[in-house]
Structure formats: C-alpha cells, structure tokens
C-alpha cells in the first residue's frame, strides 16, 4: 500500500472502520468516507487525523478526495456499480475490496470459505480446528472482525479462517488463500448481482489466483460448483456426502472419510456429533478438508467435531412450550437456507415463519417443500405478498398473513400443538424490520421466552 497517495475507505461499518484503523496504524494517510452522516469513536477519529486523514461525508467531500487518493477500499455493502465507485475508476484509482486489502497486509496462511449457505458454521468449525495447531490462529471476514483487522496481530506462520461473501470477493485481484472452499451455489443476492452468472463469477474469485501450492475444495454434490474444478489451477479436492471419492473427503455408513494419495482415514461418525441435517454433513466434510490440508491431526479434528454445537441463529433450539419445540433459524436469509432447514426436520409438522426484506429470488422450489413439510405457513414483512402469491400458486395450505413480527410469533403459538415444531426460517434478509439477522433472531428468542414464561397470551 503506497504511503504517497491517500487511501479512501468507502463505508463506515465494521469492515470499513477496521480497515481504516489498520491503515492508520501503519501510518498510511486514510480517509473513511460515508454517504450519510455518521459518528466515529473519538479514538479512531484522532488516529485518522494523526496521519493526515479523517472522516469525510457527502458527495462533494468524496469528489475532492479523488484528487489526492490512489486507492479506494470498498466495504462489503458498497456495490461495484455504485456511481462513486465508477467515478473513482474513471479517475484512475485502484478499487479493491477490504478482503484484498487484508490479504496484501498479511503474509500468513488463510483457509477461505465461501458459498451461498453454510459459511458461518464451516468457518467456525475450521477456526476451532486451527486452534489445535502450534501457531496463532484467528477467524474473520464476514464473521467477527474485518479481515484486515483480524490479521493485524497474526504472525507470518499463523492461520486465518476467513468467511467470505460474494460482496467481499467482488474486487480482489491478488487474493490467494492456501485453501479455498466453495460450499454450494444457489440463487441469492440477485438484487445486487442481477444474474446467477455474475453471482457465480464473484464466488470463483476465491480460487482464481491459486496455483499448485494451494488447494481448492469444492462440493461434488453441487452440479454447478462441481464443474468449477476444471477452472482452478490449485490442487483439487472434492467433498461429497453422496458419492465415494477415490481422492477427496466423503461419507460412507455415517463415517467421515479422508481419501488422499491412496490412503483412507476415518475421522468420526455422524452419530457422535451434535449437528443434524444434510447441510451440516456437507459443512463438516468441508471443514475436515480444511483441517487436513492445514495439518490438523485426525484425532484433533474428531475432538473438535464431537464437541461442536450448532451456531447461534442456525436451527438453534430456543424452548419447549407445551411439548412444542421452537427453533430460531434467523440466519436463513435466502430460500436455499430455508429449504435446508425444512429438510432437517424429517418428520415435518412444521409451523414456519417466513418473510422479511425480499431478495427477489425464485420461490417455487421452496414452496413445493413448504407444501410437503409444513402444517402452517405464517408470512410477515415486506416480502409477504409475493411469498403468499407463490405459496398459493404451489398449493400450500394453511397460509396466515401476520401484521407484525410479534403477531407472527403469537399466531404460531396459537396454532402449534404436539407433534409440531415452530421454526423461524425467513428466507429473507432482515432489513425491513431489524438491523441484521442476529437482532431478528434475538428478538424471536425474547418473544418465545416470554411465551414460555406466560408473559404473553
């Protein structure tokens, strides 16, 4: 990163603030720019000012910065076709993502995980596995702190488990992780990427710069992701829960098996784990691949897996009320994630709460499963009318429209009885009602616990 030209970090969220702080710590003149008014922590503002930078707000400020800056660092929430991004490119600035910045500042090892669903669970498991190595490790990216901030204290021999979204992978040019994982690809974020092709191209950036010294881990069971094996220059490792692989990570009779260079090693059996659902089997397979190529022992990987509990907001058990279990799956921000949640409950009888900020993805595949698995579908949020139309078209019975989030939970409680389960799995982002999916999930849990305590009728 040049010390001659100023750097603009676009977006004052978690990633943007982290990137700006790291650059300022390295004595780089950096301006944190935001379209709307915002307030910085006094310590961060003083740090930026100490290197000749600061906080910039509004269009006029942005355009003036283009005269002194050579690099524009994008926070994940800033789209590549944003007018200011295009203007910066026209003015000759190099535009990179916060992940690319972090990679350039870090010389250590990275296991990078992307995919439409399963990223957080897989990355969290990998992070626990990396802790078993005799070197420092951390978890960052789309989970926890900004990647550039997380790697600041890691040494050259350290390991980072990085969860990466398609947004974070849009503007990378030299990013080359030691291990690159693609879990799956299904429609998501089409309001930003516009087409599945563009969405997939962003995901591929995770392995584009890899060579023979790196490993590309792909889901053999995903028909799209499987074909990407022909495009990587890294060593290819497939994982599969359906096929026995001569070279790769697979399942057989419930066992997770590593087959590599003619040797087979069993890590553990699915019956030993606290995770359930086919999607989690895929997550475990991918995590085993990461652990294996990072040098984690079989016994350590097995121990991590046996002790790992489901992450918060992903099919998270909340409470049992009158024999009816309630589950929080607020992290299901797209239809495929909700499909995986529905499939995890093999007996069906689900009271499903869905809806929120509409991502405009196709609904028919999900609604076909909703018709099969649910006893009632409760719709809420900005997406409820489109969801209702799709559900009716697919013949889903017992559709209920809720006036609010609270009304949806109350209606679910009124309808539910043994042997049913109540599942919040919105298939939508949360931005119509909440700051993010954790806030939505925590509010759901609060309402359920109030019902459990008899405080809400």
Regions found by a protein language model. Name each.
Residues 4-6, 24, 63-67, 76-220, ...:
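Phosphate-binding loop of NTP-binding sites
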Residues 1-97, 101:
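N-terminal leader/targeting and accessory segments in enzymes
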Residues 56-59, 96-100, 233-251, 302-306, ...:
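Beta-strand->loop->alpha-helix junctions that form or flank phosphate-binding loops
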Residues 3-6, 16-26, 268-375:
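Nucleotide phosphate-binding/pyrophosphate-handling subdomain across enzymes
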Residues 29-36, 216-220, 351-354, 373-382:
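Short internal beta-strands
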Residues 23, 72, 113, 142, ...:
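Residue-level signal for inorganic ion chemistry
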Residues 43-49, 364-420, 455-457:
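C-terminal helical cap/extension that packs against the catalytic core
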Residues 30-34, 139, 161, 238, ...:
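Short beta-strand "acidic-cap" motif of Rossmann-like dinucleotide-binding folds
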